[in-house]
Amino acid sequence: MLKLFSAFRKNKIWDFNGGIHPPEMKTQTNGTPLRQVLLAQHFVIPLKQHIGAEGELCVSVGDKVLRGQPLTRGRGKMLPVHAPTSGTVTAIAPHSTAHPSALAELSVIIDADGEDCWIPRDGWVDYRSRSREELIERIHQFGVAGLGGAGFPTGVKLQGGGDKIETLIINAAECEPYITADDRLMQDCAAQVVEGIRILAHILQPREILIGIEDNKPQAISMLRAVLADSNDISLRVIPTKYPSGGAKQLTYILTGKQVPHGGRSSDIGVLMQNVGTAYAVKRAVIDGEPITERVVTLTGEAIARPGNVWARLGTPVRHLLNDAGFCPSADQMVIMGGPLMGFTLPWLDVPVVKITNCLLAPSANELGEPQEEQSCIRCSACADACPVDLLPQQLYWFSKGQQHDKATTHNIADCIECGACAWVCPSNIPLVQYFRQEKAEIAAIRQEEKRAAEAKARFEARQARLEREKATRLERHKSAAVQPAAKDKDAIAAALARVKEKQAQATQPIVIKAGERPDNSAIIAEREARKAQARAKQAELEQTNDAATVAEPRKTAVEAAIARSKARKLEQQQANAEPEEQVDPRKAAVEAAIARAKARKLEQQQANAEPEEQVDPRKAAVEAAIARAKARKLEQQQANAEPEEQVDPRKAAVEAAIARAKARKLEQQQANAEPEEQVDPRKAAVEAAIARAKARKLEQQQANAEPEEQVDPRKAAVAAAIARVQAKKAAQQKVVNED
């Protein structure tokens, strides 16, 4: 009983929801054997004829190529393309390809030499002795991709299946109207197709192998049954004709009763599907050693005089194939690549044949009927009834028109197989498939942009983390590479620390002085003397660093002399205007005298420290002499006009005498330091000597006429002198600081 149920289930088929039954229109071509087409003069081979990235070019312009020679390198999911014939590479440039957008893609353009020479072919007749990995790599490097329309790399698909494939399905349904490429291939090359199926089974090691074929192909069914007559490992399943039974998910459900989950793949349920044409290409790649350079293409439509199926070289322009079949275009002729439901209109006929090209349809105006204008949706739900994937095309249509990408994704627009059944039954003639294609392309672009943004964010975060790590490493390296003191430096540091500790200990100890003893200030005195010595050494060092050849500024000396003269004039005016009865404070007079003496000594030191090379400007000396003579005359006039009873203050007289002596010494030193070549006017010298003698006599008379009774307090004079010395010392230190 169990065996009976197993046998019943083994031959059981399931039916999917939806689907349509359009006119088949296959009789135009399925009765004509396969034929070859004359070679074209130019071939355009796009680098990307599959799902995935294009390969890396390995030829250059001007290279000679042979048929089957790789034009690109296939790495990872990149599938290589091969030269369809022998010739010369004339260009590598963008060219429009077989795509609904007709966008230009990078292509290799070859001029055929007409010889059609192959590369050396190395076939693996005993393929069973090869490992699974070797077979998959050979299939991949020979450019085999899904020839049913998807174009997925076959090697990658076999590698992804692994050991979890239990059922291998060969899709021979070919359900779309007009297309008979697989039908004719099975009629003419059934043995090679079965041999390719056995190679795939050897790689995957499935539990069962199923061939699904529609019942509208009786000749192909009979040829396959004849080849499989003595075989028990491959089962041929004939299914009812219904569109789209050839869809991967639909055929999987029909043969196994299993449904592929949303967003999943057939390998998730242990099923792997390959096309009949793909199995034939695998046989030629493994056993014959021939890369895929041609495929079967159906040329059909009432605009073609000789419809049929031909072996078309990849890269052959569509125009060349149509002309070979007797193409008779009308005024508004349309050429469709693919079937009438899933195909797309070509913008021009220079598009090349690629791996996924299975049909070229050139219908007449009678076949297409009158074009009908798109109308508004009437919500009849006919599209939902016809959908084989149980979607809601009406809702997806509104979401696509409204750019509501999230809602379209939620309603599983990605599961749409673009079969065109919804558009076929739509009474409003709405091209639903075009809307869905555009919406899926926009969603894919948005996801690609989001992926790029996420990758950029990840790169930025990784960069920030790397910078933080480098910063932490750098700080750690700086800490570890800090300067370590040498042995002698350590000793010095230890000694300094010991001295500091000793001083701190001494500072914390209380100072006790016995009665009758004086405190020991020797340390403080020594420190003070050390600071003084350090200051003197610093001053000496500063004096030594000065350049010996530097000439002292005469302007500074002149300014000091002018200040002294100004003070002298001011003092004389004060004396002349003073009242006879005005008494001067003797303490102030003593202080002024001390200040005058300090200034005089400071001036003498500056003159004594002046460099011997210092030169005195004779013009300035003459000016100073004239000023001195004017002062002398003014003083004589003041003395002549003074009252005989006026008493001169001896303190002021002493100050004036000191100033006069300082000026006299300054003048003598300037004359002594003058150049020996410089001659002094004798008349001026005599005048200056006379003035000096007059001042001296005047001073003597003033001192003689001074009151004998007036005595200066010696204590006050001493205090004034001390103050004067302190101020003089402070002025000297300030000068040193200013010079520094």
Curated annotation (Swiss-Prot):
Ranges for domain 4Fe-4S ferredoxin-type: 369-397, 407-436
Intracellular or extracellular location(s): Cell inner membrane
InterPro entries registered for this protein in UniProt: 4Fe4S_Fe-S-bd (IPR017896), 4Fe4S_Fe_S_CS (IPR017900), Ion_transpt_RnfC/RsxC (IPR010208), Nuo51_FMN-bd (IPR011538), Nuo51_FMN-bd_sf (IPR037225), RnfC_N (IPR026902), Soluble_ligand-bd (IPR019554)
Enzyme Commission number(s): 7.-.-.-
SUPFAM superfamilies documented for this protein: alpha-helical ferredoxin (SSF46548), Nqo1 FMN-binding domain-like (SSF142019)
Membrane topology: Peripheral membrane protein
UniProt cofactor note: Binds 2 [4Fe-4S] clusters per subunit.
TM segment ranges: none
EC category: translocase
Disulphide linkage map: none
NCBIfam families according to UniProt: PRK05035.1, rnfC
Purpose: Part of a membrane-bound complex that couples electron transfer with translocation of ions across the membrane. Required to maintain the reduced state of SoxR.
Family in the record: Belongs to the 4Fe4S bacterial-type ferredoxin family. RnfC subfamily.
Name of the protein: Ion-translocating oxidoreductase complex subunit C
Organism: Shigella flexneri
